[in-house]
């Protein structure tokens, strides 16, 4: 989503079983400084770190944001964050997996034969320049976020049924 400096509401969505070769398997915000993201379920999204721009390193898999462009940042008040920092509340983030590209495969997303643990990364800023501040939300992990006592962390939301996306890395 590249919304410019306009208000944008993202709400009441089920964003599940998506794959990105870079970041934000579920949602990726770029140049969107005025976003309210609420009442959404973001589950079972995967990032593979296989894009030319990812350098093989894991990135947030559920919701990812990044540095604002210089052109957009120049239009914002001086006290504005330098990344798209959405208002996040009343969301469920669960089982979003951030892979690492190693050789000819992806580690950390649960592929058959991968000895590495699954790397859960629900939300964050892809280039590490800030932290997101979700509130009143369920999350599997807090990586990339500011802790809030209003969040429920590590408690399975026990959805009625799940589906695991089948992923294969071809040589």
Predicted segment positions?
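Predominantly extracellular beta-rich ligand-binding scaffolds that present long acidic/polar faces
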Residues: 7-171
